[in-house]
Amino acid sequence: MMEWDNQLQPNNHHSSNLQGIDVNGGSGAGGGMYVKVMTDEQYETLRKQIAIYGTICERLVEMHKTLTAQQDLAGGRMGGLYADPMMSSLGHKMTARQRWTPTPVQLQILERIFDQGTGTPSKQKIKDITEELSQHGQIAEQNVYNWFQNRRARSKRKQHGGGSSGNNNGESEVETEVEALNEKRVVRPESLLGLPDGNSNNNGLGTTTATTTAPRPEDLCFQSPEISSDLHLLDVLSNPRDEHLVGKMGLAESYNLYDHVEDYGMSG
């Protein structure tokens, strides 16, 4: 009996060792596999990484909110669309649409430059003038350009002998985009329209204005007899609002408005 007990004890001890191997990731006598995906240390490292990533995401969200709030505040001060410094030049063009009155100092400088007889300054010269005048008040490049256009047209009207004696060099002018467009129509060379008679008259006040009569198709295209069958397409030019388009069309006498009419199937 004693010998039998001694034989059972080694067997039991061996069996317990196998169970320990099974639990710790080994293979038991039954052939089952027990595998751990990661150790406790690896699991703890992964948990810390996830926590760090979560903190980073929260900080990124806070930074985005802060930057958005700053941009909104800057946009409110700068006019919304022009908060970007790259858009500052467009901002000058937009402010040119507003009514502008030169200060006495600005007007004196403008008159002095105009009296030098250089005509309408170049783009770079206008930029330099604007920079100089900005020291004496608010002004944009478009304001300077419009002022020289209007001043030149007014000087031409005076040369025609119909100018009012009350209009002196010190009078104040208000520049608008509509005024600039009107002046462009007045100074438009009528000879470019291809009209032999000029179609200009004097209203008795010294102001030479262009008539609202639409140019005749046969006068506009007299150099292209081959397109006489397509002259009916020029009826759209009878609208007075499109007269400024006619001036652009007549800039080059050799330009044929109907070079590609047949390509688009409009020749009828």
Curated annotation (Swiss-Prot):
CDD domains: homeodomain. One of its GO terms (molecular function) is DNA-binding transcription factor activity. The keyword Cell division does not apply. Disruption phenotype: Early flowering. Altered fruit development. Siliques with narrow replum. Reduced number of lateral roots. It comes from the Eukaryota. Residues 95-159 bind DNA. Gene3D superfamilies: Homeodomain-like. Keywords: Developmental protein, DNA-binding, Homeobox, Nucleus, Transcription, Transcription regulation. One of its GO terms (cellular component) is nucleus. SUPFAM superfamilies: Homeodomain-like (SSF46689). Belongs to the WUS homeobox family. PANTHER family: WUSCHEL-RELATED HOMEOBOX 13. This is WUSCHEL-related homeobox 13.
